[in-house]
Amino acid sequence: MSSFLSKRFLSFSQRAMSQESLKFKSLIYSSHDSQDCTKVLKVHNYKPKKGSETSIVLKTLAFPINPSDINQLEGVYPSKPDKVTDYSTDEPSAIAGNEGVFEVVSVPSSVSTLKPGDKVIPLQANFGTWSTYRTCDKESDLIKIEGVDIYTAATVAVNGCTAYQLVNDYINWDPKGNDWLVQNAGTSSVSKIVTQIAKAKNINTLSVIRDRENFEEVAEILEKKYGATKVISETENGEKEFGKEVLPKVLGSNAQVKLALNSVGGKSCANIARKLSKDGLMLTYGGMSKQPLTFPTGLFIFKGLKSHGFWVTENSKRDPENKIKTVNEVIELYRDGKIISPKEDIRALEWDVNNASDEEVLQLITDGIKTKGTKNMVILKW
């Protein structure tokens, strides 16, 4: 048999396999519940009504349970997937999950950039990642990932891209090493990636973390392992004496604090804003305290403070090419050893695809949603 015919036969066999033997099992929802979103989730077994023969078939390797996923189930997130009847459901439904990493199982003959075995992530949110398998009509809706572990691949679209764009897309940095950024929530996964990306660009970072008994131990990890230039407590962040006497010595005489990254809100936000130099920029990408942003009026009038929101999902919709560029550059930083994933923040939950019952799968996801204070990631065992 010729090489061409062999490839065509293999492609046909792979498509046939995807239609007949693959068991599609997904976490779906058709309604929302702002009080207990786990009540709207169901495990659904089905064969896709369309697309499996002419589409790219993907096997899920891992997906995180992100706050945005939970907010979608609650019905309070601005970005929501369309509810459809493509999954053989009685009523229009959506598959939960925005982020994850997949392995290509099969491709139609029209696809030239992907092959079975390739690792990919979705280009956009609302992909429906909480599933054993997915189909995708267009190869342009996927980003190929090479050379990183599944933990990194499964989180690069949100945490990795957020950190990279916060550091790189808004400020013209001086490469001489006098520029600073300040951020709260310094122990968060995004903040740990921010400090590493900044260090690779010769940017200094001042990371603010909550007061705690083991402050020195945590600060040492953030500085030595994740590259923060200096870690301070929220108490120090709010002290006038610290700001006047200690901080100038930390920053140095020629320092310019050009960027403040806020994911907390409330007083913490106001206090990091005070550390900005003239014409500094505040970017807000979260609000963990659930307190409104409060800024001293004088920062706007006399220091020219600028304050903007940041939403990586909207950035990706507005400029898909920049999303692809961002992912590729973040992956390159990982491969070059300039940044590492904060894997200690991740709690792995194993989904035994071949042995777990529907009830066990639902309980696994429910536990992941309800367990707070850690990043839960579901790893599919095949």
Swiss-Prot record:
GO term, biological process aspect, one: fatty acid biosynthetic process
Cited InterPro entries: ADH-like_N, GroES-like_sf, Mito_Enoyl-ACP_Reductase, NAD(P)-bd_dom_sf
GO molecular function annotations of the record: enoyl-[acyl-carrier-protein] reductase (NADPH) activity
Record has rRNA-binding as a keyword: no
Coarse class of the protein's main subcellular location: mitochondrion
Annotated NADP(+) binding sites: 159, 187-190, 210-212, 285-288, 310-312, 375
Active site residues according to the UniProt entry: Y77 (proton donor)
Pfam family name, one: ADH_N
EC number, UniProt record: 1.3.1.104
Location(s), subcellular: Mitochondrion matrix
Transit peptide, residues from-to: 1-17
Catalyzed chemical reaction(s): a 2,3-saturated acyl-[ACP] + NADP(+) = a (2E)-enoyl-[ACP] + NADPH + H(+)
UniProt keyword terms in alphabetical order: Fatty acid biosynthesis, Fatty acid metabolism, Lipid biosynthesis, Lipid metabolism, Mitochondrion, NADP, Oxidoreductase, Transit peptide
GO cellular component: mitochondrial matrix
Domain of life assignment: Eukaryota
Enzyme class: oxidoreductase
Assembly and oligomerization: Homodimer.
Function: Catalyzes the NADPH-dependent reduction of trans-2-enoyl thioesters in mitochondrial fatty acid synthesis (fatty acid synthesis type II). Fatty acid chain elongation in mitochondria uses acyl carrier protein (ACP) as an acyl group carrier, but the enzyme accepts both ACP and CoA thioesters as substrates in vitro. Required for respiration and the maintenance of the mitochondrial compartment.
Record-stated family: Belongs to the zinc-containing alcohol dehydrogenase family. Quinone oxidoreductase subfamily.
Protein's name in the database: Enoyl-[acyl-carrier-protein] reductase, mitochondrial
GN (gene name): ETR1
